[in-house]
Amino acid sequence: MTETTGVATAAERALRLVVEGMSFPAILTVPAGEVAGAVLLVPGSLFSDANGDYPAWKVRPHVYAHLARQLAAAGWASLRYAKPGPGTGTETLDADAAVAHHRFATRVTVARAALETMRRELADAGAAAPRAVVAGHSEGAVVAFLLAQDAPAVDGVVCLAGPSVGLIGIMREQVGDHLPPGASVDEARANFDAAMAHVHRGEAIPRELIGLPGTMMLGNVDLAGWAYIRQVDAVDPAAEAAHVPQPMLIVQGGRDSSVREHHAHRIAAARGEGSTEVAFFPELQHFFKPLPPGTPPMQAFGLEGETDPRVVDAIARWGRAIAPR
């Protein structure tokens, strides 16, 4: 553990997680005073650093750093960590072992290691948390659902803009967001479906299907990338949420064009008799920032500024009501 810094009402310490031949930057944030609990922040898809920025695309929502520091102000410790990818600070230590990270299941392995590290580091610092919560953002919510089912030390799960369907289903919903003026959404989705038929069979997408409305960006993914996407898509998030035994808080923004509002309702319905609460914020986007109406999806995704503190207010209030398992 290195680089201890003070951040207002918190201390932040940089760590490295070593899992399956790779080293991941992570940051432990510890509040001043009594610790109400600890939150593991599980990142979503794409190449994000520990703060929740995307250096490869120069998109910097800073969402995980904002959440961590707001949580600390509310008395909660947290751990956030990077994902493999350009500019995120991850390092390959053993190339043969690191092949494991081409499998979606390894995301759960990394999250489990991060959870154990968070608990150990807090205990060593004399700040053991009375309750532990796993908060997964976007695709990270799916990881959180899978982790919590086999983690008795987890007292609660927070679904932050989590999907209720597989990744290819989410991609299909987004097809209409990237069309030129006048293009037909129905035609674009038909093109997308034709391309995905090849992906589901493990085939390369034919060249004649690339570059059409609905498939403009699909040519950037190679066969290995599609193999990984198929693994993610094979998981049914709503079904996995139903199997989570812990209490769950679902947080959703009404102007989220990446994972739309109906997913929150579908996950809540899938929970059945499970203890579930929904915190809905009509004007927030995917990174929980207020979004002016009519903002184009790509501009919405790149929005900077502080993450709305009402999200952490909801997490902290809900979390304090959880009885430790």
Protein language model regions, located:
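N-terminal cap/lid segment of alpha/beta-hydrolase-fold proteins
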Residues: 2-34, 38
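Short, surface-exposed "cap/lid" segments of acyl-processing enzymes
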Residues: 33-35, 39-73
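Alpha/beta-hydrolase active-site loop
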Residues: 99-122
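Primarily recognizes the serine-hydrolase "nucleophile elbow" in alpha/beta-hydrolase
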Residues: 117-178
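Accessory cap/linker subdomain of secreted extracellular hydrolases
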Residues: 158-239
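Short beta-strand/loop motif that positions the catalytic acidic residue
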Residues: 244, 250-252
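Short alpha-helix in the alpha/beta-hydrolase fold that links the catalytic acid
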Residues: 246, 259-269
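Catalytic active-site module of serine/aspartate enzymes centered on a nucleophile-bearing elbow/loop
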Residues: 287, 293-325
